[in-house]
Amino acid sequence: MLFTLAWASLAAVFSFSIAMVVWGRNGDGTLNF
């Protein structure tokens, strides 16, 4: 249970960071990195 929860949170953070990079490069200009 604890391992599954930790893995899910890790996957969520990883996916979010990837999304931020993509939005930063291909965004509408509101996110400027």
Curated annotation (Swiss-Prot):
Entry keyword annotation includes Transport: yes
A Gene Ontology term for the protein's cellular component: cytochrome b6f complex
Bilayer disposition of the protein: Single-pass membrane protein
Keywords: Electron transport, Membrane, Photosynthesis, Thylakoid, Transmembrane, Transmembrane helix, Transport
Transmembrane segments: 2-22
Record GO biological process: cytochrome complex assembly; photosynthesis
HAMAP family: Cytb6_f_PetN
This protein's name: Cytochrome b6-f complex subunit 8
Organism: Synechococcus sp. (strain WH7803)
